[in-house]
A protein has these predicted regions:
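Binding-site signature for planar aromatic cofactors or substrates
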Residues: 1-100
């Protein structure tokens, strides 16, 4: 069982940012790190101290996806570092150059 270091309000703020500003990155993360190459969309649906949760659209079906963090997070500022790491690793796995 995982523990959360983040309040529901903080999780909602992070999810809103990821979904509004990084929707394409969410898809790359799911494709590259979860190995779901047919994902056509993905939205962050939650997170805790150990990982980020997404709902991926695969063949018009919503599929839950969990991407673990590299280590347990204890502070909000660590989330950005992990999200960037996930994006960069996903790009590498897919043979793409990161655009940011």
């Amino acid at each position: 069982m995982t523990m959360t270091a983040f309040s529901p309000e903080v999780v909602a703020q992070i999810a809103r940012h990821m979904n509004d500003d990084h929707a394409d990155d969410n898809v790359l993360i799911v494709r590259g790190l979860a190995g779901i190459s047919t994902a056509s969309a993905a939205r962050m649906s939650g997170m805790d101290a150990d990982g980020m949760d997404f709902e991926a659209t695969v063949n018009d079906i919503l599929v839950p996806v969990r991407i673990p963090f590299s280590a347990r997070l204890t502070e909000r500022r660590q989330v950005r570092t992990e999200a960037v790491r996930m994006y960069q690793e996903a790009c590498a796995a897919l043979g793409l150059e990161p655009t940011h």
